[in-house]
A protein has these predicted regions:
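Short, Lys/Arg-enriched segments at the junction into DNA-binding effector domains
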Residues: 10, 120-150
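Receiver (REC) domain active-site loop signature in two-component systems and cognate sites
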Residues: 61
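Acidic, metal-coordinating helix/loop segments flanking the phosphotransfer/catalytic sites
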Residues: 37-54
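Active-site residues of response regulator receiver
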Residues: 58, 85
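Short amphipathic alpha-helix used as the core "switch/output" element in two-component signaling
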Residues: 46, 67-78
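Charged docking surfaces used in two-component/phosphorelay signaling
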Residues: 22-30
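Acidic catalytic/metal-coordinating carboxylates
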Residues: 39-40, 65-68, 92
Length: 150
């Protein structure tokens, strides 16, 4: 089930392993997420739009690898990205995070851990969107003073 107060979130799952994407998509759908699949980085960039709340991204893929895909996503979007990859060495994890990934989960992984991490990322992203700054003008002798209130 998706967590209370959260509408069904749309996830873009990007991996060239068809069997894995089929399995993961089914697990995520049963958990309450809407899932769209792309099998390489270029396909992901073509499909990515504002309706996606999260991208799950492999690194080792044909056409456009996950690192290059992440760089291109970060040029135009702040959508949360979680790397899901067999490249689990410390240098790979650090590089992914430094390039803008929000989380990094090496394969193989536990389905429950994946879903828990997804929910945590979406919860943080939702909380950030709710922080709306109110601008309150105050007039004082023909000058306007602005107070920004969080």
């Amino acid at each position: 089930m998706y967590y209370k107060g959260m509408k069904m979130s749309k996830i873009l799952l990007v991996d060239d392993d068809i069997e894995l994407t089929d399995l993961l998509a089914e697990v995520l759908r049963l958990t309450g997420f809407e899932v769209e699949v792309a099998n390489n980085g270029q396909e992901a960039l073509d499909k990515l739009n504002e309706s996606h709340q999260l991208v799950l991204l492999d690194i080792m893929m044909p056409v456009l690898n996950g690192i290059e895909t992440l760089k291109k996503i970060r040029q135009t979007s702040n959508v949360p990205v979680m790397m899901l990859t067999a490249r689990g060495e410390e240098i790979d994890r650090v590089l992914g995070l430094e390039l803008g990934a929000d989380d990094y989960l090496p394969k193989p992984f536990n389905d429950r851990e994946l879903v828990a991490r997804i929910k945590a990322i979406l919860r943080r992203a939702t909380q950030q969107k709710k922080k709306i700054y109110k601008i309150q003008p105050h007039f004082h002798q023909k000058k306007i003073h602005w107070n920004f209130v969080a």
